[in-house]
Design a protein with these regions (language model features):
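Active-site-proximal helices and loops of the catalytic beta/alpha 8
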Residues: 1-74, 79, 98, 108, ...
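Proline-centered flexible-loop/turn and helix-kink motifs
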Residues: 1-4, 84, 114
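Active-site clefts of carbohydrate-active enzymes
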Residues: 76-97
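Substrate-binding cleft of secreted/luminal carbohydrate-active enzymes
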Residues: 109, 113-127
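Surface beta-strand/loop "capping" patches
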Residues: 187-206
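Asparagine-centered strand-capping/turn motif at beta-strand->loop junctions
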Residues: 213-217
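Beta-strand-rich binding/interaction modules
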Residues: 220-244
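C-terminal beta-strand-rich structural cap/linker in extracellular carbohydrate-active enzymes
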Residues: 249-267
């Protein structure tokens, strides 16, 4: 009563192919044994495991097959989507410090039908591998302590051309855009079986539409818009390119560079 908007998150660990285990612990689930955890949100560990491996190994099918199991959850949109946390190898390390793969992961996290959680430091590509203990993935935030030689909060010690600053600016653009998108917060999700390593999905809410195209392959791919006519019809005339790097939208195709992406938003 005192905190009506306060939510509790359950850290439910289940393997990549076990969404039903996670669903058991979600508050709204109707369990046969009558149990209700009263936990509204759970960490989506199956999605974390499959998504991180999808971007590491260029395997778009892992994304598709994982989200195809959303029917198991009564409210998949209430799950926490993560690319890592304090108990896991950092995402930038998982993708072998590949900036292009990292960006695909961030875009997916920001636009899929989950509540995104970004682990501190991942917004500028902190690395950390679980070797002897968890300390390797829980390093100090640069600038979080007096006397730090580098400070990510004000940029001291970093050049604007540094990798860290580039990733930080990228994240600022993505997440500030997301703040204003009700279609991403509350919209439905429609996705398509990947072709040529390209994963395409659409978020819809009333007349608002956002289309996300991710090329998980290390090669240029040309998408024929007629293959996705139900969401891409009239794309060039009726949609605007919002976020992209070196991706071209033509009258009938979308030309994606290696690890290319584009977010399209209806006018």
């Amino acid at each position: 009563k005192e905190f009506p908007t306060l939510s509790i998150v359950g850290e439910v660990w289940s393997a990549h192919n076990q969404p039903p285990i996670g669903n058991y612990w979600q508050q709204s689930t109707t369990n046969k044994d009558g149990y209700s955890s009263q936990i509204e949100h759970i960490m989506d560990i199956p999605l974390w495991e499959n998504a991180t491996q999808a971007f590491k190994n260029n395997d778009a099918q892992k994304l598709y097959y994982t989200l195809s199991q959303d029917f198991v959850y009564e409210h998949p949109e209430k799950n926490f989507g993560i690319l890592g946390n304090h108990d896991m190898e950092r995402f930038f390390t998982t993708v072998d410090s590949n900036v292009a793969k990292y960006k695909l992961g961030i875009i997916f996290l920001a636009t899929t039908n989950r509540i995104p959680q970004l682990y501190y430091g991942d917004e500028f590509g902190m690395t950390g591998k679980k070797n002897k203990d968890d300390g390797y993935v829980r390093a100090d935030m640069p600038g979080g302590w007096d006397g730090d030689a580098k400070n990510i909060f004000n940029g001291n010690g970093f050049a604007e051309s540094d990798k860290e600053m580039g990733l930080l600016r990228f994240n600022q653009e993505i997440w500030n855009w997301r703040k204003k998108q009700a279609v991403i917060h509350n919209g439905s999700m429609k996705h398509f079986y990947p072709k040529q390593g390209v994963y395409i999905y659409q978020r819809s809410l009333n007349n608002q539409k956002v289309i996300v195209v991710l090329n998980l392959k290390n090669e240029k791919i040309i998408i024929n818009q007629t293959d996705y006519a139900e969401i891409l019809k009239g794309l060039a005339a009726n949609n605007v390119q919002f976020i992209s790097e070196n991706t071209t939208v033509n009258a009938t195709t979308i030309d994606l560079p290696a690890y290319g992406y584009i977010i399209l938003q209806s006018n």
